[in-house]
Amino acid sequence: MAVNLPDLRIPAGEWLKTAFNLPMSTNLDYSLELFNHPGFIRAMEFDRLGLYDKASTEFSALLTENQDDALDVFRLIKVFLDKGYYRSALEASKIIAKLSGYADTPFSAAYPPYFTYIEYGAYYLPWIQAAAEKYNLSELLLLSVIYQESHFGAQAASGAGARGIMQLMPATAEQIATETGFLSTFEASDLDVPYYNLELGSNYLARMLYVFEGDDYQALAAYNAGPGNVMSWIALTGDDPDVFLNTIRYQETRVYIRNIVEIFNRYSLIYGQ
């Protein structure tokens, strides 16, 4: 599943010049104006200081400000990837697709695969592969859940308090960390560390799959809405997955599962699995 993005970036850059009528001499890596923008300078300084949540906020604002400029968005993608701000890179690739008219046809042969591999990136791949093997999970399922939960944003946080790439509630994560001995002490901020979040989230997803006897729909519903709710829905529907999906009383959870199925199918198509 590993992809050499730097190699794919070269033809993507040439395509960008043609698609947006840019001079062939255009510098695709650097812009004095962009890299001296106060927001860019703040983001880089926050990143240097390890204040990743603040850096992420600044990068997101900078991307929004430049969302009509395909060239600067392309330049920012490289910065985001180099610095590990994968959510911003993913969002930037969507902007390129929109500006170039490929938002609805991202798999077109005329559209550079560079952007598709960024939007559906196999980020944190060594950790995902290790977690998948440890907990007998599908690598693509883990990628799909992370995509749906956070778009690979390490600093992602929900209004309900869920945090990190797999959007774990601190109480749930602490329980798993304590039971498994994975962390000797647990702080909610540990969930902002992708490796910790992935380990705890994979453990929880594997637990849900065990409880619901390998039923993906039921396990995903439990991951999103809690196992208690899922058990009450099963009591009404039995084992038919389609009936179960339509009986889920929370629209958010129904949409959640359908989104993950679609994301999973796209990952399967892109990576040939």
Q: At which residue positions do the language-model features occur?
A:
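Alpha-helical segment of the N-proximal tetratricopeptide repeat
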Residues: 29-61
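Catalytic glycan-binding domains that act on GlcNAc-containing polysaccharides
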Residues: 1-16, 29-31, 54, 61-273
